[in-house]
């Protein structure tokens, strides 16, 4: 086996590193997952709630295998991967574009693309199966010493079909890893009731999913971060806190054990641990969150115009049915942008591109954001995701609808889905010959 042969533990062990990152080890073989250990993500929108333990970072470096669930930066963070070397083995789902795989090969030649249903052997009594989910995400089923661990990370289970599909793959589940708070920022500052509703709905759905999957132990994770900039900090006002989350889930599922782990904590996969110490540490961290100062370069109109023109050209080039969609959606393919740092207003559509505008009627579709956020929206492959998830913007309902329509091309193209005749035909055939999968080809 390539990689570090001398790892720190022989008996089965779980070390919680931070957010969605943990290290599983067994018989001197270790598997790390989704390392985000420092820095801001989603165009400088989120930061970690708690500091990563330095010893955990050292253990990450020594991991034999590192699995990434998907390409979002709180799971696959290029700037954090500098801690790894050619001695590490990387694991990722099989994809068409191979973006992640090609990036990882610059660090190590030991990159394994895991196809659906293939069980990858990590070591003795230690395997991982990667299950793609919807368009971009994936979950993992880990077998370790006759225990089954299901890591759902960000997979948003929406219906019974998906639950049944997953349960058929896993069989009885010993340990379930799940996200527990909202990870989206499309809510204006004065819409606190909306955010409260999100939080309640997340807990109710999570509880329902737990009842169906019926694991012995649940570890809520992948939500230990916060909205950290001045233009999205208000988004923290209704997020689910770990102590209240476990309190609610425990009442709804009294026969299931719920475990809270703090960065650096270790667990032998069997022992009963008290959550009190971890709760106290997280509550102290919640109290300390604050806006992180960040110098952001302003982008002048000429550069924004060039970025918008390139965005239009790329959209039309990659989607040969663009003009068909544009004909039927002209009124939704336009939006006004209020640039908060430049104190200027602009109008955008696919015909004129970006042009200077006067005052904006509140009944028109609008979105307020910084010039840098707008530039990132036009230029980044997942600029739309970064904006919607990061929450560094506000808009009216019409504006949000326009954002969804205008940038759906970009978002889907990043997932290798294109609006062209081949795609329409493929989707038509899929409806005729229904497949029983929970993911789209990627």
Predicted regions and their residues:
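Conserved beta-strand hairpin/beta-sheet module of binuclear metal-dependent hydrolase folds
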Residues: 10-56, 137-153
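Pre-active-site segment of Zn-dependent metallo-hydrolases
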Residues: 29-71, 78-83, 157-171
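Active-site neighborhood of phospho(di)ester-bond hydrolases with catalytic His/Asp-centered motifs
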Residues: 32-34, 63-76, 91-94, 150-155, ...
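Active-site environment of divalent metal-dependent phosphoester hydrolases
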Residues: 39-40, 71-76, 98-100, 118-121, ...
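Metallo-beta-lactamase
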Residues: 90-147, 247
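Mobile, glycine- and charge-enriched loop segments
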Residues: 136-138, 143-200, 285-311
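Cap/insert and terminal regions of metallo-dependent hydrolase folds
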Residues: 160-252
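Feature captures hydrophobic
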Residues: 267-442
